Amino acid sequence: MICSSLLLATILLPTINSAQNAEHDHYVSPWKTPWTYEQAAHWSELDPDYAACNAGKQQSPIDIQQTEKSPLPALRFEYTSAPLKYVINNGHTIRVDYHDAPQSGSFLIVGDQRYQLTQFHFHRPSEEYLHGKPSDMVLHLMHKSAEGKVAGVAVLLKSGAANATVQQLWEHMPATEGQQAVSGVDLNPAAMLPRATGYYTYTGSQTAPPCSEGVTWFVLKTPVEISAAQITAFATLYPHDVRPVQPLNGRVVKESQ
């Protein structure tokens, strides 16, 4: 019991020295108008720039119920180990930023489209629902092509064995909102992917203001395990950082064969 408590304490304890010794330890929010998840139904009323949050017809996340099986291209994850720029507590989630291209060195290839990984972040529980149910958490890996197209990969996370890469991140996440830490570590995000990369795909949006549409989402069908203690560590900071599911409005969700 004592060992379990010590393990949980180690997971929950932020790396204070990392934040204090960071090159920049204060995060500058990109949102000119503050928002919260509790205000999700009223985001469009907070700022005209958030109008798509209510007026948009291709919003995310969604509840994946019915799918159309299609001969879709395989997802090629050309991820590599690279130094992280910041581990950020932005007041809504824990987000990891990469340096500008080509320094991240990690790419998603879908058919003839090439996207660079720009950042990733977490939600608890998952924003994506499968047949009416969320997963314990979700990892969102966000990518952008040279033409400016955005692609998000959702990796569902479920309680099970501890994930060493997630643990590495948790050891560097700032406990205080508005702080960012230069981690000084290399990390390969491929270690947070499942072996099987079959997926669901649809056209959606960012899941936070300004809710910009035109995002191609790939929701991986196979979940990845993280430990209950790792889920608790995140929940201590963000127990419920999710946007409610949005109407499909006639959109078709395709499923890889």
Locate each region found by the language model:
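Alpha-carbonic anhydrase
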Residues: 4, 16-257
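Hydrophobic h-region of N-terminal signal peptides that target proteins for export
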Residues: 9-17
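Sec-dependent signal peptide recognition
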Residues: 1-8
